[in-house]
Amino acid sequence: MIEEVSRNEMLSTIHYMTEHFPYRLAGSPCEAAASRYVTERLKQYGLEVENKEFYTYNSDPMYSKVTVLEPEMEIDSLPCAHIRATKPEGEIFELIYVGNGDYAAYKDIDVTGKMVLVEVSYAPPVPEKARIAYEMGAAGIMCMNWGNDEEVICRRGLKGVWGNPTEANFHCIPEIVGVGVTRGAGLKLKQLCLEGRKVEVKVTAIADRTWSIVHQPTAILHGNGSSDEFLLVCSHLDAWKPGVTCNATGNATTLEICRI
């Protein structure tokens, strides 16, 4: 089977998806078009195919701006998904560094009404950092990227609930402002905080939270019926722009397995 894998076929799929469907935000027209493309490809391979639709609690992070008031400087940022949006003119927060953002990081620190600066290179996962921050009284969270000091910002979601929320856990979604910044910018702010200086930031972060229809292409290749065992292959279709390694590569791999 490995000998039948076509590098050119997979690269063609990756290029097509990233050129035609670069920002596959769940529930968006781009995501819907990508789902139709995948569905048609699966049909061509002779599988039993269905492009399912279902409602999900969704979020579109639209815009953010972060200005450090003292010392004055503007830093690049991206808004997180599933946040409490700020006022259009922005809101001012005192910034407090809390390391990895777990419960122990808040010992003897009062973050009530403030924005916490967290590092995301280790546990707990970012949505849990946001949930803990909100539980501790924080009004906002700023996530510095992990890795080298490159000018890269990751898109992040702070929903704090896996899958669709229910009546039982809807309250677990933190009502908190959230933005992501580069590691370089985060390290500068971290140093200011560790020096004992009062760091104030003006943050504008705009994102919505709404129920919307999303798509899930599924396909079945039936066996000969001699066994109840099955093989499940999956890859998420939705993606932040440009959506190459997350996850056009995964989609191309899934389609190539189906082709073979």
PLM regions: where:
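Noncatalytic luminal/extracellular "stalk/propeptide" segments of secretory-pathway proteins
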Residues: 3, 12-115, 122
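Soluble metallo-hydrolase cores and metallopeptidase-like ectodomains found primarily
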Residues: 74-108, 164-245, 256-260
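Extracytoplasmic/secreted proteins, especially bacterial periplasmic and envelope-associated proteins
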Residues: 9-12, 16, 33, 37-44, ...
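Solvent-exposed loop/turn segments at secondary-structure junctions
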Residues: 23-24, 44, 55-58, 102-103, ...
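A conserved hydrophobic secondary-structure block that centers on an alpha-helix together
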Residues: 100-153
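Structural recognition of the beta-strand scaffold that forms the well-ordered cores
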Residues: 13-16, 51, 95-97, 115-119, ...
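Sec/Tat-exported extracytoplasmic proteins
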Residues: 5, 9, 18-25, 45-46, ...
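Extracytoplasmic/secreted cell-surface and envelope-processing proteins
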Residues: 35-36, 58-63, 124-129, 149-156, ...
